[in-house]
Each structure stands twice: as structure tokens, then as C-alpha cells.
């Protein structure tokens, strides 16, 4: 049975959707924030939260084999060792005490050409994790 299997399909077939999310996640790791449609932003938020959680575990675990395994899983998604190292060594260090909510989606209005709702997707700053 397929109970509770809801996911953001984005009007694309599976491999295209995975490719889209991988590309968007690469951009957010590289630049820190991106502007995209709200539907893509919501799908990207859950995708990136899982990726950052893996990065935090890879950065904090004492088990070397587990850390290498997690880095390889992250690299399989990002496809670039430089971005993998940036995510694990720089970005994940800011979120060690945090239990989720690493990505923020802010609605910024509508696109001029087709009136699609646009959103700003950004990594939450480390200073705002207090509280």
C-alpha cells in the first residue's frame, strides 16, 4: 500500500524531479540563497533539510567509516567534492545544536511574465538559531 507516500511531484517525472532538486541544492550550497517558484522551494526545503542533517552527522561523528559513508552519500547528491566539503566542513558546523529547520522559504511576490509565485530560499543563519 502507498499510505503516507505524499511528495512534491512538481509536474515532472522522477528522474527529472531528482535532477531539479540536485541542481537547486547545489546552487543553495554554493551561493547560500536562491530565488525560485514557491512549489520548488517547498520541495527543496525538505530535500535540503535531510542533506544538512547528514552533513551534521558526518561532521560530528567519531566513527571515521560512518563519516566517510555520509560524505559519499552527500557527494552522490551534490556531485561535486568541493561543495560536499563546503557543506560538511563549513555549513554544517553552524547547525550542530539545531534539530532541523536549516532552510528558510520567504515568499517575495509574483513573477512578471506568468505571475508564478516566487520565493527566496536561504540557509538560516547560525546566529538566529538561539531560542
Curated annotation (Swiss-Prot):
The keyword Ribonucleoprotein applies. GO terms for biological process: translation. Keywords: Ribonucleoprotein, Ribosomal protein. One of its GO terms (molecular function) is structural constituent of ribosome. One of its GO terms (cellular component) is cytosolic large ribosomal subunit. It comes from the Bacteria. Part of the 50S ribosomal subunit. Contacts protein L32. Belongs to the bacterial ribosomal protein bL17 family. HAMAP family: Ribosomal_bL17. This is Large ribosomal subunit protein bL17. It comes from Thermotoga neapolitana (strain ATCC 49049 / DSM 4359 / NBRC 107923 / NS-E).
